[in-house]
Each structure stands twice: as structure tokens, then as C-alpha cells.
Amino acid sequence: MSGSVSPLAPKTFAEMPALRGVRMATAAAGIKYKNRTDVLMMLFDRPASVAGVFTRSKCPSAPVDHCRQNLPGGIARAVVVNSGNANAFTGKKGREATRLTAEAAAKAVGCSEAEVFLASTGVIGEPLDATKFAGVLDKLAASATQDFWFEAAKAIMTTDTYPKVATRSAEIGGVKVAINGIAKGAGMIAPDMATMLSFVVTDADIAPAALQALLQAGVEPTFNSVTVDSDTSTSDTLMLFATGAAAGDGQAKVEDAADPRLDGFRAALDDLLRDLALQVVRDGEGARKMVEVTVEGAENDAAAKRIALSIANSPLVKTAVAGEDANWGRVVMAVGKSGEMAERDRLAIWFGDIRVAVEGERDPAYSEAAATAVMQGETIPIRVDIGLGSGRATVYTCDLTKEYVEINGDYRS
């Protein structure tokens, strides 16, 4: 957890309502940090539907393997998350730590280990001492309450400077339902399935298969469209749970994601995921500016996204943003190296509303002062027209500052 809050942090935080069917508690287990909570336990009063997306890293953490193994069952009764240790690249010791944690959680809750989901975040390669959970999970299960979202978000922070929370409401068949979510992430963030840790819960009654389809569709334009440093974590986990408590209000269970009754819910879920994803970008390690990169006129949407990511992940583009330098030549460079089709003499580039380049050269009406004024803002919009087709995509990133180097140079100390 950083000592100073990001200047891009929300000015106010969402008031997180209690959500029926789920309770939470946190504790300080001393996994790495001192004088702060580092374990979160989330309990479901009744079996909840569960969906999840995870890192595509070829070196996934032991908790990710555990979640993937349990996900096909479609049911969750408990989630245990720890910060300070990723339990990744820890071999047999890591798998044993995961087994012991799931076993202890299942015993505390009174459920099967197959209904327990785990996540860890922190240093890679350090064995996780699961004995630190001894006695802790029993106490958490006994003390869990419904209105603990903000504290839950704080417990899973690492280099984050503020807790990330969001809430939305919707209607399904005329019955009001709520959606609450938390996330953590500030570094090692790149679009690849989930790109950090996030846990979203609704009191809607939705079957696991429908929930999975909703999550997979919602993640692409949100968490899969943000990047801080182009590095994909070994531990990326995004999970969505449905407690089904709204059935008590007369909400009929939804089995199919294509059911039109889910239209409002889908929109609310997508909006919440976008909110959390942008909070992650705004808390990028050392970030002082957020960057919105939009590419249009590419061969197709996939090509547009790859070009946008080439721009967003370019250290030269990101340092130019940090220095408030309207260096559109670096954007040209990033387009050219993307591997996608681009015609140099058709390119047009805008910083905000200021067109800085057109038809392969600097705009004849280019104003350094006007472009610099855009770069001095807190949010920097960069738009590129490739001039070839109708493909379009938007991704979000942040600047690259000296503080990023300092934070990551000192991370293990």
C-alpha cells in the first residue's frame, strides 16, 4: 500500500450498500505487511452461482489453478483472498498452501472444498505460509457482516493507494437487484482476461452458465481494455457471484444470458466493470495522468485494438505524456510497430480536439501551444484514424513516471 494517494483517485467513494446473501470480514495475518489487514473472507449464506475469468499467463499461481478446478461446479460458498504474497511459482509448497487454506475455509464455513475459491496477490516466488491462517478463518467466518465492502477492498491492496469499490442497481423482470464490486490493482496490469483481482456480487438469481456468459462478454471492453505497464500477472482473477436472494422478492431464475430480462442487468454490470477497470488505471503505480487511446479506421475491431494497445503500452508515448510533451511522432512510431495494416499517408492523429497530424505529416494548422494545453490536463485523449476501414477500439492507460521505477525498484524491500 502506497503512502500517498494517487492524484487521480476518486474525490468521493461510492456508498456501498449491504447486499443480501453475502457477508465479509478481514484480518491482519501478518503475511507481509504490518499494522494492516491482509486477509479477506467472503461468505455466501446459501450456495451462490459463480463465474470467473483468469490470467492467460503460462505461469499461473496455485490459487488460479484451484479456482479453475472448482469453477465447473458452478457453486461458491466462500472466497479467501490474501495480499502480500502471490503464492505463484512456489511449486509443491504453493499447491499444499492452497490445499490447506481451502480445507480450513471449508471447515470454518461448513462446506465442500470444491465450493471455496482462493486468490492471492503480492510477491511472486516466495512460499506462502498457510499456517498464518490457522484460527483466523474461523474467527472471520464467525464475525462476517454484510456492510463491509470498503474494508474488504482495503484488505486486498498491495501497491494500491486507495480501495476500489463500485455499486449499481438494475431490474430483472420488474424486481430490483443490486450489484457490488471491489478490485485491486496498480501494477503488473495488462489486458489478458482479468488483469488484476476483482470480486463482484449480485443478489440476482442467475444460473452459473448465464453468469459466465455475462462476465465473459463484459470483460472485453472493460478489464481487457486497460493497461498500466503491459505486464500480465500470474494471479489475475475476476469473479462474479449471484446469491439468488432476489428470488425472495419474486425474481424468477434466469438460465440463459440471452434472456431479454437481463438487458438492464447486463448494462449495469458492464458499467460497474468499466468503473472498476478505470479505477485500476487511475491508480497505476506512479500515475499522474490517465490516457484514453481510441483507434478508428482500422481493418477491423481486433486490428484497431492491437494498434491502440501498441500506443498505450509504448514507454515512449507514456513518458511523453508524463512530461506533457505533445510528441505525436511517438504515436506514429507505435502505430507502425503494431504489426497491423496502416497507410502512412492516410494517418490522422488528434490530442484531445487538436488535430496534430494528417495525411502522413504534421497538420498545416498545428499549434504547439494548443496541443501542449491538452497534455497539461489530467485525462489525455489520443485519437488515431488509420484511414483503411471501419475497425474501432478504445483502451485506457496511464503515464509512466519516475515514481513507477521507484515503487517497483523497492517492491520486495
Curated annotation (Swiss-Prot):
Pathway: Amino-acid biosynthesis; L-arginine biosynthesis; L-ornithine and N-acetyl-L-glutamate from L-glutamate and N(2)-acetyl-L-ornithine (cyclic): step 1/1; Amino-acid biosynthesis; L-arginine biosynthesis; N(2)-acetyl-L-ornithine from L-glutamate: step 1/4. The record marks A194, T195 as: Cleavage. Pfam families: ArgJ (PF01960). GO terms for molecular function: glutamate N-acetyltransferase activity; L-glutamate N-acetyltransferase activity. Its main location: cytoplasm. It is found in: Cytoplasm. GO terms for cellular component: cytoplasm. Its EC number is 2.3.1.35, 2.3.1.1. Substrate binds at T158, K184, T195, E285, N408, S413. It catalyses: N(2)-acetyl-L-ornithine + L-glutamate = N-acetyl-L-glutamate + L-ornithine; L-glutamate + acetyl-CoA = N-acetyl-L-glutamate + CoA + H(+). The active site is at T195. It is an enzyme of class 2 (transferase). The record marks T121, G122 as: Involved in the stabilization of negative charge on the oxyanion by the formation of the oxyanion hole. Transmembrane segments: none annotated. Keywords: Acyltransferase, Amino-acid biosynthesis, Arginine biosynthesis, Autocatalytic cleavage, Cytoplasm, Multifunctional enzyme, Transferase. It comes from the Bacteria. Coiled coil: none annotated. Catalyzes two activities which are involved in the cyclic version of arginine biosynthesis: the synthesis of N-acetylglutamate from glutamate and acetyl-CoA as the acetyl donor, and of ornithine by transacetylation between N(2)-acetylornithine and glutamate. HAMAP family: ArgJ. Belongs to the ArgJ family. This is Arginine biosynthesis bifunctional protein ArgJ. It comes from Rhizobium meliloti (strain 1021) (Ensifer meliloti).
